[in-house]
Amino acid sequence: MNGVINEIEPTGQEAADRRHPPVINRVQFPSAGHDEIKVGEMLFEGSRENASHQATYGATKAAEATKKTLTGTGDGTATAFNFDFGEVVPGSVKIVTNDSTAKEVTDNGDGTLGGESESGTGTVDYATGHISVTFTAAPANTKTVTATAIPGAGFVGIANDALDASEDDGVNVVLHGTICEGIAKYNGSAASEEQLKFLSRHGIW
């Protein structure tokens, strides 16, 4: 079985480990003008398809990916909030309030929530998308608590080769199969252990 679909021949280093034939496809970006895409970058659905509608989905880095949003409401006393997203991408969770002094709790990428703001702590189960957060101070009455995350269903694949997205409108993507050890990246940095587990759940090892 030939696992390569509509691939354009890469000119440099590849992400795919071809000892186990991967499934690779050419995927359109949602629009031009993004930063450079590195080999091994985890790619996700963007906010829209390309103008020609030749692609059924777009691909972009996590920073520009389409995110799912859930909300809760403060009552002035409650500090603990729970959200259920379904599978989410490790490292993508953020929870904020619209208090006069906004509170923000971010994803540490290891199943815990916190970040640098010290606004609160919590946990996230990436496979189920269950999120529990406890703020250090209760959000004010009627103020909104907004949780955002990249849904697991929005994952497209791994960039098989590097490109300048300001000049190119698409990228060769590893959709399934083995990739070279240490090549996977999330927003330009080496993928974490939880992100590698996420890739494994989606058929990329």
Language-model-detected regions and their locations in the chain:
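Extended beta-strand solenoid/passenger and fiber regions
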Residues: 24, 59-121, 126-150, 184
